[in-house]
């Protein structure tokens, strides 16, 4: 599933190319996504000018000059890409946006876990994103904030940092990588973390996400940015997907366990605490 770095990469690849363009036509090809496409999508942003392309958590947001925004979630393997005017429609294309420069913006999702909505811009934070926590790069993510969130939680720290009500966008890959960098065992209870461990974890999350964004995200199978290019952070993964291989820091064997049905990778030597 695309996580924060992948959506940030997608945003970066589309922003400069989309701002200023007009949506000249919206074609709803298949409405059988996780949440059925609303027919209003074809009219609410028609003939509107694109003002901005941004990200909130794992959502891509496109703002228009009629005070509506398009909200896109890629689900498990959705793609949101720019294509030329002579693009031939594919089987799993769900929405096609015709742009004023002749290009097309395509939402394609083979597994249909993605979603795409139009929503009033000024109501997004209050009504659509009201349950989301703090962005990892926000100044609000401090020792005091995270300590307050963790102090009563007797559940594994990996689960806690993947909770979008606490910190947004830290998915399975980057949770394993961040805990390895911070040298914290993924099973350790959140309320058992010392202040210095919490500070190290915040720094590790930011460092890992920054490197992943710089590398264009992680493509394990399906992810591509708006230009159809994969991410290359896969080559920098220290523990994720490396079960049975040697730790790149200490040569111990990488171990795989499960948290809430998700695979977790760690080094028992480096992550002793």
Swiss-Prot record:
E.C. number(s) listed in UniProt: 3.2.2.23, 4.2.99.18
Entry annotation: catalytic residues: 2 (schiff-base intermediate with dna), 3 (proton donor), 58 (proton donor), 262 (proton donor)
Cofactor binding note from Swiss-Prot or TrEMBL: Binds 1 zinc ion per subunit.
SMART domains: Fapy_DNA_glyco, H2TH
Sequence positions that bind DNA: 92, 111, 153
Domain of life: Bacteria
Pfam families assigned: Fapy_DNA_glyco, H2TH, zf-FPG_IleRS
Keyword hit for Hydrolase: yes
Keyword annotations from UniProtKB, A to Z: DNA damage, DNA repair, DNA-binding, Glycosidase, Hydrolase, Lyase, Metal-binding, Multifunctional enzyme, Zinc, Zinc-finger
Catalytic activity: Hydrolysis of DNA containing ring-opened 7-methylguanine residues, releasing 2,6-diamino-4-hydroxy-5-(N-methyl)formamidopyrimidine; 2'-deoxyribonucleotide-(2'-deoxyribose 5'-phosphate)-2'-deoxyribonucleotide-DNA = a 3'-end 2'-deoxyribonucleotide-(2,3-dehydro-2,3-deoxyribose 5'-phosphate)-DNA + a 5'-end 5'-phospho-2'-deoxyribonucleoside-DNA + H(+)
Cofactor entry: Zn(2+)
GO biological process, one term: base-excision repair
Zinc finger (FPG-type): 238-272
Residues spanning the membrane: none
GO molecular function (one): 8-oxo-7,8-dihydroguanine DNA N-glycosylase activity
S-S bridge residues: none
InterPro entries, sorted: DNA_glyclase/AP_lyase_DNA-bd, DNA_glyclase_Znf_dom_DNA_BS, Formamido-pyr_DNA_Glyclase, FPG_cat, MutM-like_N-ter, Ribosomal_uS13-like_H2TH, Znf_DNA_glyclase/AP_lyase, Znf_FPG/IleRS
Keyword Glycoprotein part of the UniProt annotation: no
Quaternary structure annotation from Swiss-Prot or TrEMBL: Monomer.
Described purpose of this protein according to its UniProt entry: Involved in base excision repair of DNA damaged by oxidation or by mutagenic agents. Acts as a DNA glycosylase that recognizes and removes damaged bases. Has a preference for oxidized purines, such as 7,8-dihydro-8-oxoguanine (8-oxoG). Has AP (apurinic/apyrimidinic) lyase activity and introduces nicks in the DNA strand. Cleaves the DNA backbone by beta-delta elimination to generate a single-strand break at the site of the removed base with both 3'- and 5'-phosphates.
Family: Belongs to the FPG family.
Stated name of the protein: Formamidopyrimidine-DNA glycosylase
Gene (UniProt): mutM
